[in-house]
From Swiss-Prot:
Organism: Schizosaccharomyces pombe (strain 972 / ATCC 24843) (Fission yeast)
Record's subcellular location: Endoplasmic reticulum membrane
Membrane disposition: Multi-pass membrane protein
UniProt name for this protein: UPF0641 membrane protein PJ4664.05
Main location: endoplasmic reticulum
Presence of keyword Glycoprotein: no
Length: 223
């Protein structure tokens, strides 16, 4: 059993190291190649749900990395809390981003953006965080513990908070970071946010259900 735990902790260390390095690179790319108008505006890049979720994912991976090194149960529990929030959130970011850009990329990325997004960056921020958090949750963490009611409240709260934040940024900047929001009326935007929160909640439920089937035998999750 101790051998299995040590191997699991080493594999977790590798995951968190790779993820941390990749996400730091992504933030560095954003800082050096970002849209100047967005960077100088109120809220900067944190107007984007992608960047907000990326920041929480990076934090969870850094905390996970330090927990792997130190063996601290406090850090493990903190990492799990962050992961429970961001794992379904990253999943919805990937679903929404790739489905929308496959239909019309200009709905999310302005046509006049000075620096086009290279594929490696696109994948690093819109796909790999989902991969990292799913692997971490399914193979190195205990299952989600919140019941249906509280978990639904959590994701509705996140959706409402982000909606209010985006509207605050619009009041200050007079433009939306995502072009799609400029063409949706208030009712359609409310529906959009509601659907997104329901999908996030659905991801939470599905991931909670499949977790027992993902963990390898003899490798107990760290809790």
């Amino acid at each position: 059993m101790s051998s299995a735990i040590s191997r699991s902790r080493f594999n977790s260390f590798i995951l968190h190291t790779v993820a941390t390095a990749n996400l730091i690179w992504a933030f560095n790319w954003i800082n050096h190649n970002s849209d100047v108008a967005i960077r100088r505006s109120y809220g900067s890049h944190f107007q984007h749900l992608t960047v907000l979720s990326l920041a929480v994912t990076l934090l969870s991976m850094v905390v996970g990395l330090f927990s792997d090194i130190s063996g601290s149960l406090t850090l493990v529990k903190l990492k799990n809390i962050l992961l429970y929030i961001v794992c379904p959130l990253e999943t919805i970011v990937s679903i929404l981003y790739w489905s929308i850009v496959s239909y019309d990329r200009s709905l999310l990325i302005p046509k006049d953006r000075p620096v086009p997004l290279p594929l490696n960056f696109d994948i690093s921020v819109h796909l790999m965080p989902t991969v990292y958090t799913l692997i971490d949750y399914l193979f190195f963490s205990p299952p989600f513990s919140l019941s249906i009611g509280p978990s639904l409240l959590v994701y509705l709260s996140i959706a409402v908070s982000y909606m209010l934040w985006v509207e605050k940024c619009y009041q200050m900047n007079k433009f939306y970071a995502y072009p799609i929001l400029a063409i949706l009326d208030p009712i359609k935007k409310t529906i959009f946010y509601t659907v997104a929160s329901i999908i996030s909640f659905s991801c939470y439920i599905v991931l909670k259900m499949v977790h027992p089937y993902a963990l390898p035998s003899g490798a107990p999750p760290r809790s």
